[in-house]
Amino acid sequence: MNLPLCLILLDFLTILNCFCDLSVLPTRRAVRILGRRYALTATGYKYLDIGINVGPPSYVEIAIGDHRGNELSLSLETWKGLYEQRWDIQDRLCKDVRGRPITVGPLTVRFSAMNDTKLVCLDSSDVRLMMTESTFLTMINLDHCIELTYAQLDRVVDKVEAKVAQFSNIASAETKDASNAIRASEFFNGNHIIDCELFALVFDTPM
């Protein structure tokens, strides 16, 4: 069996672990702009996204997800808490995965093992994501990247909010052809990435 196929099967098997409740349906995916996506596995099955969740209110969001549509949304405080607990989590994985879970803000970190592979389950009130130890470590190693990206995005949240309000006002006044009205308005700048992504992902989509 080649390595990529092994990784695909391992990702699939982690979903079936008893800690992952398959009755939990994925929630509707948020619209994020100006984002970055980091693949957490060689297959890209699991990922970490960071971008501005378009409101109102708009805010910077960190999300861990998979290609089945599951996404776990984290605040910066929860992400930092998870990072600060990394040594305790690694210690638990090295010793006994049958111990008590670790609480990080709204998250519960549980542990398991399957076929000699140590697993980490991130459990919130409505989403559960299972990952291997190596995937968890890959994610944690992105901490400085997340910190820098978060700071950059946080500086433009107010601009995004202002654009959303302007475009929304135009769309509510021009019900027949809101898309063209937005593009023709003085508020739209086709050479600005905020305008382009908002228009393409939010205001130029079928109702």
Segments and roles (model prediction):
Residues C6, F12-S73, E77-M207:
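Positively charged, low-complexity terminal tracts
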